[in-house]
Amino acid sequence: MLTSKGQGFLHGGLCLWLCVFTPFFKGCVGCATEERLFHKLFSHYNQFIRPVENVSDPVTVHFEVAITQLANVDEVNQIMETNLWLRHIWNDYKLRWDPMEYDGIETLRVPADKIWKPDIVLYNNAVGDFQVEGKTKALLKYNGMITWTPPAIFKSSCPMDITFFPFDHQNCSLKFGSWTYDKAEIDLLIIGSKVDMNDFWENSEWEIIDASGYKHDIKYNCCEEIYTDITYSFYIRRLPMFYTINLIIPCLFISFLTVLVFYLPSDCGEKVTLCISVLLSLTVFLLVITETIPSTSLVVPLVGEYLLFTMIFVTLSIVVTVFVLNIHYRTPTTHTMPRWVKTVFLKLLPQVLLMRWPLDKTRGTGSDAVPRGLARRPAKGKLASHGEPRHLKECFHCHKSNELATSKRRLSHQPLQWVVENSEHSPEVEDVINSVQFIAENMKSHNETKEVEDDWKYVAMVVDRVFLWVFIIVCVFGTAGLFLQPLLGNTGKS
């Protein structure tokens, strides 16, 4: 016989054994019940037969799409890649049971390939499988309601209009429907009116503005039956910050650098160099961003139009700069300034542009800059004079001091020309007078030439100023006109 101490030890061990293994037995009983239920439901079940009591009755399938990720939008190939969860809900009368008979089991998770499923496919699929794989399990309730939510990655066809790239909006649709069953056999009903976006991960390039669903009953040319489909329209907008910072703003800077060419003085000799440098920088920039812009020949994107506009802008600036430099370096020996050029570019336009001559000088023929009284010497040794230069008087006072001293008062009232012609003087004095006359004529010719050259330079400056304002206006209004198109286009569509 066991002692009281031994009986207590045996009783404690029995309690510990019951506490440890009782849940295990309950689990085994539960597993056996679930296995018995599964065997009862699928022992004579045929997954290829529609779950209807009458063959004329349709299977009502409730359908909903939940998007988790907008993976990619390929503008070139016109493909939208999405990560979706497709929720199917229908009733199968052959998969019902009484929970009281199976230890209160109300739900059962069964492999999807064991049950009948509606063959819902994506009609406008571009790449990959049209139908989702049945590797996931379905949730089966005791009243026969089945909920099947398989995940799928679809690459759907989407006609895209990139006219306003990178400020474009796209409208891509996903069309789901039964591939073999018509409306008389499967009636699709949409759950809600929009795509479920509770688990959506934001995309760094695209924003989903709206995602609405619609049900359509369509009769195709191939068949007499009516087929039901559910179409979800995704209205997406491109986020333009990346393209604005890396594409548009550099182009704007290049355009305004082109405007500065016309503010650069022509005498510095670097106007064409600056134009060529801007053109080369734009060319290199275009080569870098070629991979960024969608390559399509259907339409010209907005950013492509702007790059083309900038290229034409820079090219025209080179042409205008060459023309301005040609005007700037003209001389009286090569070109004669027409009267209309003087009127327009020396009088009219400077007043309009609020320009004035850098030096306050009198406009004339240049004769005021030459000492009067000096002309070409006659052939007989007499001097022809048009004035009374003071240095000639001093010369005659030096060499004919005796004669002029006695008649100083009389000569002061007589013309210098008469004095020179009726006075006798030495050959040295004639050489000095001829030299002074030659220097004066050269000064006069140089001043006249310099004045004409200054006129041409001023005309070039006026032309530069005109094109400076023209290019500023074209640059501002051209840029505004191009980038206001998306706003006006979207307003018109709305």
UniProtKB/Swiss-Prot annotation:
The keyword Phosphoprotein applies. Belongs to the ligand-gated ion channel (TC 1.A.9) family. Acetylcholine receptor (TC 1.A.9.1) subfamily. Alpha-6/CHRNA6 sub-subfamily. GO terms for cellular component: acetylcholine-gated channel complex; cation channel complex; dopaminergic synapse; neuron projection; neurotransmitter receptor complex; plasma membrane; postsynaptic membrane; presynaptic membrane. It comes from Homo sapiens (Human). Neuronal AChR is composed of two different types of subunits: alpha and non-alpha (beta). CHRNA6/alpha-6 subunit can be combined to CHRNB2/beta-2, CHRNA4/alpha-4 and CHRNB3/beta-3 to give rise to functional receptors. Heteropentamers containing CHRNB3 have an stoichiometry of (CHRNA6:CHRNB2)2:CHRNB3. Interacts with LYPD6. SUPFAM superfamilies: Neurotransmitter-gated ion-channel transmembrane pore, Nicotinic receptor ligand binding domain-like. Residues 1-25 form the signal peptide. Activated by a myriad of ligands such as acetylcholine, cytisine and nicotine. CHRNA6 nAChR activity is inhibited by the antagonists alpha-conotoxin MII and PIA, a small disulfide-constrained peptides from cone snails. This is Neuronal acetylcholine receptor subunit alpha-6. GO terms for molecular function: acetylcholine receptor activity; acetylcholine-gated monoatomic cation-selective channel activity. Keywords: Cell membrane, Disulfide bond, Glycoprotein, Ion channel, Ion transport, Ligand-gated ion channel, Membrane, Phosphoprotein, Receptor, Signal, Synapse, Transmembrane, Transmembrane helix, Transport. It is found in: Synaptic cell membrane. Disulfide bonds join 158-172, 222-223. The chain crosses the membrane at residues 240-264, 272-290, 306-327, 466-484. PANTHER family: NEUROTRANSMITTER GATED ION CHANNEL. Residues 328-465 are cytoplasmic. It holds the Pfam family Neur_chan_memb. The modification Phosphoserine is found at residue 401. It is a multi-pass membrane protein. Component of neuronal acetylcholine receptors (nAChRs) that function as pentameric, ligand-gated cation channels with high calcium permeability among other activities. nAChRs are excitatory neurotrasnmitter receptors formed by a collection of nAChR subunits known to mediate synaptic transmission in the nervous system and the neuromuscular junction. Each nAchR subunit confers differential attributes to channel properties, including activation, deactivation and desensitization kinetics, pH sensitivity, cation permeability, and binding to allosteric modulators. Glycans are attached at residues 54, 171. It comes from the Eukaryota. The keyword Signal applies. It catalyses: Ca(2+)(in) = Ca(2+)(out); K(+)(in) = K(+)(out); Na(+)(in) = Na(+)(out).
